[in-house]
């Protein structure tokens, strides 16, 4: 069973937005502050704990269960490893590409962990979820009320904002039945024009907050190459302080809301307002035109 005092959070966001990197760096900072944390990777790539463990997890719940014949044949210590600052790390895994439902791994893993006492003596459980998929098995942490606080990693790019709005729509669907709430948007900067202002505007429209603006810094890539979090690789760096600031905000966050997703027309109008998209009249003129024709 799960302790009712544990805060169960989940990080969602467009594929490639830096969600796993942002979540691991933030959770590392939270662990530095004395928080007891478990990460449940909900991505078939099984890379949600790589920076914590200095390596990709050698096995996953679903892979080992397939080898043994049943998840009941597993031992907790075989799939739960200890990483940086004592963070517990589990990867749910998934089937081979094109075979079966990857979301099944999430359901199987969480049930196994709950039944085997993995949730004892924890302050936070964090689910790191694949891309912007909010249907079926990948929505399971939301749908079943496992994750109570959702943090959406986004940026000032159109598709990242589009994904954030879609995820907000998924949260709204289960907000009343499961009690899930949106904790805020994390802007993982891509250095687009007026990016912080744009994401704050989007957050307001979604009835939430931009909980933190994470600036772009090459030190993140340097740490990743060494399979380390920034806080471990360069603890005194400015970027490390940014992740600590975000960690404190999540620990102290009491602004948990039911989101108000917006229509595509409103999102496009917002992008036009900030110069990401051309206005409709100009847009209509360039649709379907090759580069030479628009010079």
UniProtKB/Swiss-Prot annotation:
Organism, by scientific name, is Nostoc sp. (strain PCC 6720)
**Keywords annotated in UniProt:** 4Fe-4S, ADP-ribosylation, ATP-binding, Iron, Iron-sulfur, Metal-binding, Nitrogen fixation, Nucleotide-binding, Oxidoreductase
List the catalysed reactions.
N2 + 8 reduced [2Fe-2S]-[ferredoxin] + 16 ATP + 16 H2O = H2 + 8 oxidized [2Fe-2S]-[ferredoxin] + 2 NH4(+) + 16 ADP + 16 phosphate + 6 H(+)
- Positions carrying ADP-ribosylarginine are 104
Which gene codes for it? nifH
**Superkingdom:** Bacteria
Relate the assembly described in the record: Homodimer.
Spell out the protein name for this chain: Nitrogenase iron protein
InterPro entries listed in its UniProt record: NifH/chlL_CS, NifH/frxC, Nitrogenase_Fe_NifH, P-loop_NTPase
Family, according to the entry, reads as follows: Belongs to the NifH/BchL/ChlL family.
Spell out the Gene3D superfamilies in the cross-references.
P-loop containing nucleotide triphosphate hydrolases
């Amino acid at each position: 069973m799960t302790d009712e005092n544990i805060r169960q959070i989940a990080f969602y966001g467009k594929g490639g937005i830096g969600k796993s990197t942002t979540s691991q760096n933030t959770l590392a900072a939270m662990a530095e502050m004395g928080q007891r944390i478990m990460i449940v990777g909900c991505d078939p790539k099984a890379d949600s704990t790589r920076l914590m463990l200095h390596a990709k997890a050698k096995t996953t719940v679903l892979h080992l269960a397939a080898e043994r014949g049943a998840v009941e044949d597993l031992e907790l210590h075989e799939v739960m490893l200890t990483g940086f600052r004592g963070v517990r790390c589990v990867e749910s895994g998934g089937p081979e590409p094109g075979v079966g439902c990857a979301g099944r791994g999430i359901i199987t893993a969480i049930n196994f962990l709950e039944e085997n006492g993995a949730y004892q003596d924890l302050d936070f459980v964090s689910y790191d979820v694949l891309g912007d998929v909010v249907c079926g098995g990948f929505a399971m942490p939301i749908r079943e009320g496992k994750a109570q606080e959702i943090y959406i990693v986004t940026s000032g790019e159109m598709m990242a904002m589009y994904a954030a709005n879609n995820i907000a729509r998924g949260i709204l669907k289960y907000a009343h039945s499961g009690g899930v709430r949106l904790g805020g948007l994390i802007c993982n900067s891509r250095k687009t024009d007026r990016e912080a202002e744009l994401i704050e505007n989007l957050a307001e429209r979604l009835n939430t907050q931009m909980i933190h603006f994470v600036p772009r810094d090459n030190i993140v890539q340097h740490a990743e190459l060494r399979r380390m979090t920034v806080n471990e690789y360069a603890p005194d760096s400015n970027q490390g302080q940014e992740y600590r600031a975000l960690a404190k905000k999540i620990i102290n966050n009491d602004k948990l809301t039911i989101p108000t997703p917006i229509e595509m027309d409103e999102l496009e109008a917002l992008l036009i307002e900030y110069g990401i998209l051309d206005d409709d009249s100009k847009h209509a003129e360039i649709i379907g035109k090759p580069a030479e024709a628009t010079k």
